[in-house]
Amino acid sequence: MKIFQELIDSGSIKEEKIDFVLMKKVLAKSRRSIRSSKLILNDGDSEGSYELAYEAMLLAGRALVFSFNYRPRATGSHKIVADFVKKVLNDNEDVKLAFKFDKMRKNRHYLIYGAGLAISEIEAKNAISSANSLLEKIEIIIEEKNPQKKLEI
């Protein structure tokens, strides 16, 4: 597709047919990460909760990439997925969600490799909410593309 040409030309994504069964499994794992994020937050671990909420967004984003019959290359895959999501989600509210995902990617990177960043309970709750919204949006997009979806009679 033309909107992905830059990612294709740079070698960031490659064409690969991926079935809907795998996409459903990745989406289910994303949903589990959101549930785990809530549990960890209730236990007082805001940073762990934030990281799991980000993981849920990453998994949902990967499923979205798969739904267009692409796979991100391994090196830099988190950024590639975030960039791909930005290209697909293009209405006003969805763009905000895609940018939240990218901001969370950068924060999570700093949590893992940097020092001094603390995540508050409010930030973790917002991350969970954003992860849930992104997952729901991506589930709708993927379901619309599913050739096996139920016929409405």
Q: Where in this protein do the model-derived segments appear?
A:
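Terminal alpha-helical segments
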Residues: M1-I153
